[in-house]
Every structure is written in C-alpha cells, then in structure tokens.
C-alpha cells in the first residue's frame, strides 16, 4: 500500500466505504467490475475473474480494504505511467523542432541541466556517453524515455 500517495488512499477509502453498505469492512468481489468501470477500466469477464482470483487471496468472495487497494493501485499506477509517458512525448516533441524523431545530445544536455542545475559537466558527459553508446550525437524517443524514467 506504500506506493500510492495518501490522498489516493483516502479517495479509495471513500469509494470502498460507499460500496461497503453493511459496514462489514469488506465488499463483494461482484462489485469489482463496477468499481473498475467507475475508474475508467472496462474488462471482459475472464480478465475480471483473473484479477479477482489474484487479489482475493483468501478466496472469501469478499475484498478487505487492503485487497481492494492492491487491486486499484495496479490501475492507478498504470495510468500514472501512461500520463508520464505522454508528457515526456510532448516534451520530446518540443525539443525535436524538425520533427525527425530525434534530438541532439547537446539538446539533451541542456534538458538535463535544466532539470538538475547541480549536475556537473563530468556527470553530464558520462550520462550522454552512456545514452549515445553508438556515438551518433543523437537520441531518439526511446532513449530519451530511458534517461527520464530510468527504465
């Protein structure tokens, strides 16, 4: 549960409590599809059953709050990653002025300096060398993503 920010956990608690009509501290796994749809995720029955089986570890047919958070966090974290990739794609496009699918290592150097004004020239050189392993002097979007996300 530690990968979600407290405000998201509070939001999930409100949603959970709304579905926990009998105030038993758990909700029926039958509600999972409805909840995921409210979060903007429509899943087919097979996928839904697979997720429920994974999350309802004790097979009770009910989800305790921790199980519910575990389920919801998969979707929330995924969306955050997608949103971040979209933002990085936009940023890359801004720097790729010619629209040719890459930026120069000099441009990347400027971006990295803007993000971290304490970075040394040596660190920058090492990073650029690692990223531009073929020595082409250019960085494509995938390489840019790798630098920005560390993945």
From Swiss-Prot:
One Gene Ontology cellular component: myosin II complex
Protein name: Troponin C, isoallergen Bla g 6.0101
PANTHER family reported for this sequence: CALMODULIN LIKE 3, MYOSIN LIGHT CHAIN 1, 3
CDD domains for this protein: EFh
InterPro entries: CALM/Myosin/TropC-like (IPR050230), EF-hand-dom_pair (IPR011992), EF_Hand_1_Ca_BS (IPR018247), EF_hand_dom (IPR002048)
Annotated binding of Ca(2+) 2, by residue: 132, 134, 136, 138, 143
Family: Belongs to the troponin C family.
Binding site for Ca(2+) 1: 56, 58, 60, 62, 67
Pfam families reported in the protein's UniProt record: EF-hand_7 (PF13499)
Keywords for the protein's UniProt record, in alphabetical order: Allergen, Calcium, Metal-binding, Muscle protein, Repeat
PROSITE patterns: EF_HAND_1, EF_HAND_2
Molecular function, one GO term: calcium ion binding
Stored SMART domains: EFh
Ranges where the EF-hand domain occurs: 7-42, 43-78, 83-118, 119-151
Function text: Troponin is the central regulatory protein of striated muscle contraction. It consists of three components: Troponin-I (Tn-I) which is the inhibitor of actomyosin ATPase, Troponin-T (Tn-T) which contains the binding site for tropomyosin and Troponin-C (Tn-C). The binding of calcium to Tn-C abolishes the inhibitory action of Tn on actin filaments.
Species assigned in the record: Blattella germanica
Superkingdom per UniProt: Eukaryota
